[in-house]
A protein has these predicted regions:
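N-terminal catalytic cores of secreted or lumenal carbohydrate-active enzymes
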Residues: 81-82, 99
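Active-site mouth loops of central-metabolism enzymes
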Residues: 16-35, 82-93
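Glycine-rich, proline-tolerant flexible connector loops at the mouths of alpha/beta enzymes
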Residues: 48-74, 82-91, 112
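Acidic (Asp/Glu)-rich catalytic clusters
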Residues: 67-75, 97-108
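Short, well-ordered coil/turn segments that N-cap beta-strands
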Residues: 9-13, 47-49, 75-80, 106-108
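Short amphipathic alpha-helices and their capping/turn segments at secondary-structure boundaries
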Residues: 1-7, 94-105
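N-terminal small/glycine-rich loop or linker at the start of catalytic domains
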Residues: 5-28, 109-113
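Catalytic domains of carbohydrate-active enzymes, especially glycoside hydrolases
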Residues: 35-57, 101-109
């Protein structure tokens, strides 16, 4: 089986890649928006199942823009995931800007920490 004809097989390992978020936290690493788009396309070409695109929130404009542009990437295999946190105890979830940003990313998958 090659990456170009990957199909779901029960018991098969699925890959969830967090390079665009967690990898960007390494010392000396700062992905540009163009870097993030190219990496996402290459991960899709490799057959990665899930790509964590980043942490869209009002204080992170690069990741917000990535998710805006990601909708038009035309990924063939991979599904994008947005990463974020639950609502803070002191806020009404309907008023939480970070939760709203996760929804605005319009991904099928959201990873919550």
């Amino acid at each position: 089986m090659t990456a170009t004809n990957l199909k779901y097989i029960p018991g098969m390992v699925e890959i969830y890649d967090s390079t665009l978020r967690d990898g960007a936290q390494a010392e000396g690493i700062s992905f540009s928006l163009e870097d993030k788009i190219l990496i996402a396309q290459k991960l899709d070409d490799f057959g990665v199942h899930y790509i964590e695109g980043g942490y869209p929130n009002p204080t992170n404009p690069k990741d917000m823009e990535f998710f805006e542009k990601a909708a038009s990437l035309g990924l063939k295999k991979a599904k994008l995931a947005a990463f974020g946190s639950t609502c803070r105890a002191s806020l009404d979830p309907a008023e939480d800007r970070n939760l709203r940003a996760l929804l605005d990313a319009e991904t099928e998958i959201v990873t919550i920490f």
